[in-house]
From Swiss-Prot:
Needed co-factor(s): Mg(2+)
Residue pairs linked by disulfide bridges in the UniProt entry: none
Binding site for Mg(2+): 8, 58
InterPro entries: 4-PPantetheinyl_Trfase_dom, 4-PPantetheinyl_Trfase_dom_sf, ACPS, Ppantetheine-prot_Trfase_dom
Gene: acpS
GO biological process, one term: fatty acid biosynthetic process
Name of this chain's protein: Holo-[acyl-carrier-protein] synthase
The organism's taxonomic lineage, starting at the top: Bacteria, Bacillati, Bacillota, Bacilli, Lactobacillales
Length: 117
């Protein structure tokens, strides 16, 4: 049974401005593992990655029912399986977590579905 659904849309340029304003922005938003992956990218691809990971964190917090203020950014980690499918590693929700992530040239969208039973 679906117990939560969250969607977030992020403008990639907003993350470029945040990085320019604070060079440690990515370190604050990403987990250590996510930051390690982020550091392998440059330019626009790095910004897409950062915006995507943030959007997943936001979407998860909405699905969880608390919003981002109650879920620490470091508590939700998005990784990819060997086929490239994103998945969320977290200890907050006891159930199945589904995640979908997509990009355009200017936007990132993330959807998270929380399921039990």
């Amino acid at each position: 049974m679906i117990v939560g659904l969250g969607i977030d849309l992020a403008e990639i340029d907003r993350f470029e401005k945040a990085q320019e304003k604070n060079s440690r922005f990515a370190e604050k938003v990403l987990t250590a593992t996510e930051f390690e992956l982020f550091s392998h990218y440059t330019g626009r691809r790095a910004l897409e990655f950062l915006a995507g990971r943030f959007a997943v964190k936001e979407a998860f917090s909405k699905a969880y029912g608390t919003g981002i203020g109650q879920v620490k950014l470091q508590a939700v980690e998005t990784l990819n399986d060997p086929q490239g499918k994103p998945y969320i590693k977290q200890d907050l929700f006891d159930g199945v977590v589904h995640v979908s992530l997509s990009h355009t040239a200017t936007l990132v969208i993330a959807e998270v579905i929380l399921e039990r039973g």
